[in-house]
Regions:
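N-terminal alpha-helical targeting/anchoring segments
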Residues: 1-76, 90, 94
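TRNA-recognition modules of translation machinery and tRNA-sensing kinases, especially anticodon-binding
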Residues: 71-374
């Protein structure tokens, strides 16, 4: 033991031993540096390992191996060729992509007039249902997250290239615009031992989200499907680990209930192992019907992460046996507001390019029934 040898030498007055003491100190410094480097290397490897899929999850490579578990709603039949949301929006003079390209760049949009009102109505409608009917607590969170917060939910280090890092004060920690409110809402329990009686904790927030969409070059270049900035209503649940899968069913039902109320056709799929997100143990995607594409497109993703994020965030609770154990975390879109706007435009379009306002949204829009060019 080098430390013990060094201590023994310090009690001696022998010159040669003092020299040896210096050598031991140097050796200890080297070992300490090696240990730190090895730990950093190990941490980097471990932080890049994804969650383990739940046994329920089908094996597969990509979206082609996902499993449809539900189809709901009636796909509309038109006696004309349905237009895309961006054609409809531009013809109404209420979606302006060219102006956004001029002021900001590609993959941004100006939403104007009644469509801006419709976007806000959708967000408020979703929040009201989640708060009043589904028992979620509304939060208005910061839109900027620290590096540590992003690590906690699994966005970093693996997905650094997809994040918008912002320059803050010189010398301060790295900061990022949130890619989803999941990041900031889940971290509410970071470094905490929560009281078991407070579980489940259910939070909801409507926020802008910011993503570079790295790796999606050439995909969905037209319209609002894939934007760098978009609104999303996000649900987050903190539960006892044993209740994760039950909570996942509940959360997914909260999302599909909105589509039922909006009378939009959709399907629910369980993602295969190869298509799941980094932090998830099990994920349902909800896909809404888009007439212009003649197919279903993702409008919500609901995931159980079991204790994966909790271990990174050190979020725990004391169970019945007085043991301190990790919480389970879940997150889900309820719903992506921009994509819901797209679905309303396309499914409720009329031959003349006007849009019928869904009944449940009219109280949020001064009882407006039809959006048309004036």
């Amino acid at each position: 033991n080098l430390e013990k040898e060094k201590k023994d030498i310090s009690k001696s007055k022998d010159e040669s031993l003092f020299k040896k003491s210096k050598e031991i100190s140097s050796e200890l410094d080297k070992i300490s540096t090696q240990q730190k480097n090895t730990k950093t290397e190990l941490d980097n490897i471990l932080s890049g390992i994804p969650n383990i899929p739940h046994p329920d999850v089908p094996n597969g490579k990509d979206e082609n191996d996902n499993l449809e578990v539900l189809k709901a709603g009636k796909v509309p039949e038109f006696d004309f060729k349905p237009k895309s949301h961006y054609e409809l929006g531009e013809n109404l003079g209420m979606l302006d992509f060219d102006l956004a390209t001029k002021t900001t760049g590609s993959r941004f949009v100006f939403v104007k007039k009644e469509l801006a009102l419709l976007e806000r109505a959708l967000s408020n409608f979703m929040l009201d249902i989640h708060i009043v009917q589904n028992g979620y607590q509304e939060i208005s969170p910061p839109l900027i997250a620290s590096e540590n917060t992003m690590y906690g939910t699994g966005q970093l280090p693996k997905f650094e290239n997809d994040q918008f890092e912002i320059k803050f004060d010189e010398g301060s920690d790295r900061k990022y615009l949130i890619p989803t409110a999941e990041v900031i809402l889940t971290n509410i329990v970071k470094d905490k031992i929560v009281d078991q009686k407070d579980l489940p904790m259910r939070y909801v927030a409507s926020t802008p989200c910011f993503r570079k969409e790295a790796g999606s070059y050439g995909k969905d270049t037209k319209g609002m499907i894939r934007q760098h900035q978009f609104y999303k209503v996000e649900m987050v649940s903190i539960v006892e680990k044993e209740n994760c899968l039950e909570e996942l069913e509940r959360m997914t039902n909260c999302a599909t209930d909105l589509l039922d109320k909006l009378e939009l056709p959709y399907r629910k799929v369980i993602l295969c192992s190869g298509d799941m997100g980094f932090s998830a143990e099990k994920t349902y995607d909800i896909e809404v019907w888009l007439p212009s594409e003649n197919k279903y497109r993702e409008i919500s993703s609901c995931s159980s992460c079991s204790t994966f994020q909790a271990q990174r965030m050190k979020s725990r609770y004391k169970n019945k046996n007085k043991e301190t154990v990790f919480v389970g975390t879940l997150n889900g879109s309820g719903l992506a507001v921009g994509r819901t706007l797209i679905a309303v435009l396309e499914n409720y379009q009329q031959k003349d390019g006007s849009i019928i306002v869904p009944k449940v949204l009219r109280p949020y829009m001064n009882n407006l029934e039809l959006i048309s060019a004036k």
